[in-house]
UniProtKB/Swiss-Prot annotation:
A GO molecular-function annotation: metal ion binding
Active site: H117 (pros-phosphohistidine intermediate)
SUPFAM superfamilies: Nucleoside diphosphate kinase, NDK
Name listed for the protein in its UniProt record: Nucleoside diphosphate kinase
Protein's organism: Tolumonas auensis (strain DSM 9187 / NBRC 110442 / TA 4)
Length: 143
Protein backbone atom coordinates (compact mmCIF):
# COMPACT_ATOMS: atom_id res chain seq x y z
CA UNK A 1 0.00 0.00 0.00
CA UNK A 2 1.13 3.47 -0.83
CA UNK A 3 1.21 6.55 1.37
CA UNK A 4 -0.56 9.24 -0.61
CA UNK A 5 -2.19 12.61 -0.18
CA UNK A 6 -5.70 13.71 -0.95
CA UNK A 7 -7.61 16.95 -0.77
CA UNK A 8 -10.85 17.52 1.11
CA UNK A 9 -13.32 20.36 1.60
CA UNK A 10 -15.84 20.61 4.40
CA UNK A 11 -18.53 22.59 2.59
CA UNK A 12 -20.61 25.53 3.87
CA UNK A 13 -23.58 23.36 4.87
CA UNK A 14 -21.43 21.16 7.14
CA UNK A 15 -19.56 24.16 8.60
CA UNK A 16 -22.93 25.79 9.40
CA UNK A 17 -24.05 22.58 11.17
CA UNK A 18 -20.92 22.75 13.37
CA UNK A 19 -19.78 19.21 12.49
CA UNK A 20 -16.17 19.96 11.53
CA UNK A 21 -14.86 18.07 14.57
CA UNK A 22 -17.02 15.05 13.85
CA UNK A 23 -15.77 14.91 10.27
CA UNK A 24 -12.15 15.27 11.42
CA UNK A 25 -12.74 12.46 13.92
CA UNK A 26 -13.89 10.19 11.08
CA UNK A 27 -10.82 11.06 9.02
CA UNK A 28 -8.48 10.29 11.90
CA UNK A 29 -10.26 7.05 12.87
CA UNK A 30 -9.78 5.90 9.26
CA UNK A 31 -6.03 6.46 9.54
CA UNK A 32 -5.97 9.69 7.56
CA UNK A 33 -3.62 12.32 8.99
CA UNK A 34 -4.55 15.98 8.61
CA UNK A 35 -1.31 17.56 7.39
CA UNK A 36 -2.66 20.99 6.38
CA UNK A 37 -5.90 22.82 7.09
CA UNK A 38 -7.46 26.26 6.88
CA UNK A 39 -10.86 27.89 7.06
CA UNK A 40 -11.76 30.49 4.45
CA UNK A 41 -14.64 32.13 2.65
CA UNK A 42 -14.24 31.51 -1.09
CA UNK A 43 -14.52 34.52 -3.36
CA UNK A 44 -16.46 34.18 -6.61
CA UNK A 45 -13.13 34.18 -8.47
CA UNK A 46 -11.63 31.43 -6.29
CA UNK A 47 -14.73 29.27 -6.66
CA UNK A 48 -14.76 29.79 -10.44
CA UNK A 49 -11.08 28.85 -10.63
CA UNK A 50 -11.45 25.76 -8.47
CA UNK A 51 -14.54 24.50 -10.34
CA UNK A 52 -13.39 25.61 -13.83
CA UNK A 53 -13.79 22.05 -15.18
CA UNK A 54 -17.55 22.30 -14.55
CA UNK A 55 -18.06 25.64 -16.35
CA UNK A 56 -20.97 25.39 -18.77
CA UNK A 57 -22.63 22.48 -16.95
CA UNK A 58 -26.22 23.00 -15.74
CA UNK A 59 -25.27 22.94 -12.05
CA UNK A 60 -22.26 25.29 -12.31
CA UNK A 61 -23.90 28.58 -11.24
CA UNK A 62 -25.69 26.99 -8.27
CA UNK A 63 -22.46 25.26 -7.23
CA UNK A 64 -20.57 28.57 -7.19
CA UNK A 65 -23.40 30.30 -5.32
CA UNK A 66 -23.42 27.54 -2.70
CA UNK A 67 -19.64 27.32 -2.29
CA UNK A 68 -19.40 31.08 -1.73
CA UNK A 69 -22.38 31.18 0.67
CA UNK A 70 -20.33 30.66 3.83
CA UNK A 71 -16.99 29.53 5.18
CA UNK A 72 -15.40 26.25 4.14
CA UNK A 73 -12.58 24.22 5.65
CA UNK A 74 -9.96 22.85 3.27
CA UNK A 75 -7.49 20.18 4.28
CA UNK A 76 -4.82 17.87 2.98
CA UNK A 77 -5.02 14.31 4.25
CA UNK A 78 -2.20 11.77 4.16
CA UNK A 79 -2.23 8.02 4.68
CA UNK A 80 -2.20 4.63 3.04
CA UNK A 81 -4.51 4.66 0.01
CA UNK A 82 -5.75 8.06 1.18
CA UNK A 83 -7.81 8.85 -1.93
CA UNK A 84 -9.77 5.59 -1.86
CA UNK A 85 -10.22 5.58 1.91
CA UNK A 86 -11.35 9.20 1.96
CA UNK A 87 -13.89 8.65 -0.82
CA UNK A 88 -15.26 5.60 1.00
CA UNK A 89 -15.80 7.75 4.13
CA UNK A 90 -17.59 10.41 2.08
CA UNK A 91 -20.03 8.11 0.30
CA UNK A 92 -21.84 8.75 -2.98
CA UNK A 93 -22.14 12.34 -4.20
CA UNK A 94 -25.91 11.81 -4.13
CA UNK A 95 -26.84 11.41 -0.45
CA UNK A 96 -29.83 9.24 -1.40
CA UNK A 97 -27.40 6.71 -2.89
CA UNK A 98 -24.77 7.03 -0.15
CA UNK A 99 -24.16 3.95 1.97
CA UNK A 100 -25.42 4.21 5.56
CA UNK A 101 -22.75 5.43 7.94
CA UNK A 102 -20.91 7.57 5.39
CA UNK A 103 -20.53 11.30 5.93
CA UNK A 104 -22.91 12.16 3.09
CA UNK A 105 -25.55 9.63 4.16
CA UNK A 106 -25.44 11.11 7.66
CA UNK A 107 -25.17 14.84 6.86
CA UNK A 108 -25.86 15.75 3.21
CA UNK A 109 -29.09 17.35 2.03
CA UNK A 110 -28.63 17.22 -1.76
CA UNK A 111 -26.10 16.54 -4.51
CA UNK A 112 -24.79 20.11 -4.15
CA UNK A 113 -25.19 20.51 -0.39
CA UNK A 114 -23.44 17.23 0.30
CA UNK A 115 -21.23 18.29 3.22
CA UNK A 116 -17.83 17.36 1.79
CA UNK A 117 -15.68 17.21 -1.32
CA UNK A 118 -12.87 14.77 -1.96
CA UNK A 119 -10.37 14.36 -4.78
CA UNK A 120 -11.22 11.52 -7.14
CA UNK A 121 -7.69 10.79 -8.42
CA UNK A 122 -4.05 11.47 -7.63
CA UNK A 123 -3.98 14.05 -10.46
CA UNK A 124 -7.01 15.87 -9.04
CA UNK A 125 -5.56 15.71 -5.54
CA UNK A 126 -2.28 17.30 -6.66
CA UNK A 127 -4.08 20.06 -8.59
CA UNK A 128 -6.55 20.78 -5.77
CA UNK A 129 -3.89 20.78 -3.05
CA UNK A 130 -1.78 23.23 -5.08
CA UNK A 131 -4.81 25.49 -5.57
CA UNK A 132 -5.16 26.09 -1.81
CA UNK A 133 -1.78 25.32 -0.21
CA UNK A 134 1.89 26.08 -0.71
CA UNK A 135 4.36 23.30 0.04
CA UNK A 136 5.47 25.25 3.14
CA UNK A 137 1.95 24.99 4.59
CA UNK A 138 1.95 21.18 4.45
CA UNK A 139 3.34 19.30 7.45
CA UNK A 140 3.78 15.57 6.66
CA UNK A 141 3.17 13.27 9.61
CA UNK A 142 3.84 9.89 8.02
CA UNK A 143 7.10 8.70 6.57
Amino acid sequence: MTIERTFSIIKPDAVAKNIIGEIYHRFECAGLHIIAAKMLHLSQEQAAGFYAEHKGKPFYDNLLKFMTSGPIVVQVLEGQDAIRRHRELLGSTDPEKAQAGTIRADHAISVTQNAVHGSDSSESAAREIEFFFTEDEICPRTR
